């Protein structure tokens, strides 16, 4: 689906202000996967994200998206199709809304790619239903809606382009806890429908709950990758790099360090923690 091979990126190369942001990145996003990218501010994850849909081109190495190869020598006309294959929901996407009605805003993207108005509005209606926005809102101005509803409109606008990969850049930033949970459940539902998803986040619990593969970035390098269940076992390594772990993993690790219990494998979700503690309680009771 998407493959990075020895990708390096330098801002303002061949100048006194040259600044290298990515170092020999090898990364793969498989079709149908839910891949997470984790890192602090300055880790390179935003630069990497912009390579996913061709907003940036590698200084060295190559990025393959489907059958399109992007390198330092690629022309813009060669890269443009990548932007239809990979849809990016940037932070606070509602700031990009501009049309007079919700339906028109969502239909704008498909029309911009040459789809007739009637068909574009049909696609828009399907995507608005997908994101859970009732038709009573479709003829309203997007600016009459709540923040969470506006974000759903913006996400529907990206989905209306029917991308093969949906990239989410800190998608719950600024939302209250209830809206945040609803938003993550929405993305999981979209993923379950067959959509390939890439999540850029600093929230480890979201990675544990939803992702099936994760890459950790630090200062432009991938320092760890694997399934969340494997990566989050390295609690001390992550702490040394000032990266957190899911709350359930932290609790289990602290409990294990007291000597009260030994886990074969640390849980990464609340559900796993409850199951393990219940099992230990039952076994302990059986011994008594």
UniProtKB/Swiss-Prot annotation:
Compartments in which it is found: Cell membrane
Gene Ontology cellular component annotations, sorted alphabetically: ATP-binding cassette (ABC) transporter complex; plasma membrane
CDD domains reported for this sequence: ABC_cobalt_CbiO_domain1
E.C. numbers: 7.-.-.-
Membrane topology of this protein: Peripheral membrane protein
UniProt cross-references to PROSITE patterns, sorted A to Z: ABC_TRANSPORTER_1, ABC_TRANSPORTER_2, CBIO
SMART domains assigned to the protein according to its UniProt record, in alphabetical order: AAA (SM00382)
Positions with a binding annotation for ATP: 39-46
Keywords: ATP-binding, Cell membrane, Membrane, Nucleotide-binding, Translocase, Transport
Biological processes annotated in GO: cobalt ion transport
Main location: membrane
Active site per database record: 170
ABC transporter domain ranges (all copies): 2-244
MF-aspect GO terms: ATP binding; ATP hydrolysis activity; ATPase-coupled transmembrane transporter activity
Domain of life: Bacteria
Family indicated by similarity: Belongs to the ABC transporter superfamily. Energy-coupling factor EcfA family.
The protein's role, per its UniProt record: ATP-binding (A) component of a common energy-coupling factor (ECF) ABC-transporter complex. Unlike classic ABC transporters this ECF transporter provides the energy necessary to transport a number of different substrates. In this organism these probably include biotin, thiamine precursor, niacin, pantothenic acid, queuosine precursor, riboflavin and thiamine. Uptake of niacin or riboflavin into proteosomes containing EcfA1A2T and Niax or RibU has been demonstrated. Uptake requires hydrolyzable Mg-ATP and is substrate-specific; NiaX-containing proteosomes did not transport riboflavin.
Quaternary structure, from the entry: Forms a stable energy-coupling factor (ECF) transporter complex composed of 2 membrane-embedded substrate-binding proteins (S component), 2 ATP-binding proteins (A component) and 2 transmembrane proteins (T component). In L.lactis forms a stable complex with EcfA' and EcfT and substrate-binding components. In E.coli forms a stable complex with EcfA, EcfT and individually with 3 tested substrate-binding components (BioY, NiaX and ThiT) with a stoichiometry of 1.1:1:1.
Designated name of the protein: Energy-coupling factor transporter ATP-binding protein EcfA2
The organism of origin for this protein: Lactococcus lactis subsp. cremoris (strain MG1363)
């Amino acid at each position: 689906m998407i493959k990075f091979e020895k990708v390096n990126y330098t801002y303002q190369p061949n100048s006194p202000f040259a600044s290298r942001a990515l170092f020999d990145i090898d990364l793969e996003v498989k079709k149908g996967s839910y891949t997470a990218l984790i890192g602090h501010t300055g880790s390179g994850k935003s630069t990497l994200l912009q390579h996913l849909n061709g907003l940036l081109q590698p200084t060295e190495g190559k990025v393959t998206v489907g059958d399109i190869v992007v390198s330092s020598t690629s022309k813009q006309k060669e890269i443009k199709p990548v932007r239809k294959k990979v849809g990016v929901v940037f932070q606070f996407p509602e700031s990009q809304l501009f049309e007079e009605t919700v339906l028109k805003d969502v239909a704008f993207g498909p029309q911009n790619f040459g789809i007739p108005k009637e068909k574009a509005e049909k696609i828009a209606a399907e995507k608005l239903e997908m994101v859970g926005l009732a038709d009573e809102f479709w003829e309203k101005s997007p600016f009459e809606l709540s923040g969470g509803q506006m974000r759903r409109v913006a996400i529907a606008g990206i989905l209306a382009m029917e991308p093969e990969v949906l990239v989410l850049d800190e998608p719950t930033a600024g939302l209250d806890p209830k809206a945040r949970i609803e938003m993550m459940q929405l993305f999981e539902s979209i993923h379950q429908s067959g959509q390939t998803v890439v999540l850029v986040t600093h929230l480890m619990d979201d990675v544990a709950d939803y992702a099936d593969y994760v890459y950790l970035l630090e200062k432009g390098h991938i320092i760890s990758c694997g399934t969340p269940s494997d990566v989050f076992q390295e609690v001390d390594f992550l702490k040394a790099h000032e990266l957190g772990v899911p709350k359930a993993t932290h609790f289990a690790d602290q409990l294990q360090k007291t000597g009260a219990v030994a886990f074969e494998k640390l849980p990464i979700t609340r559900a796993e923690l409850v199951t393990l503690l219940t099992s230990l309680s039952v076994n302990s009771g059986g011994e008594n």
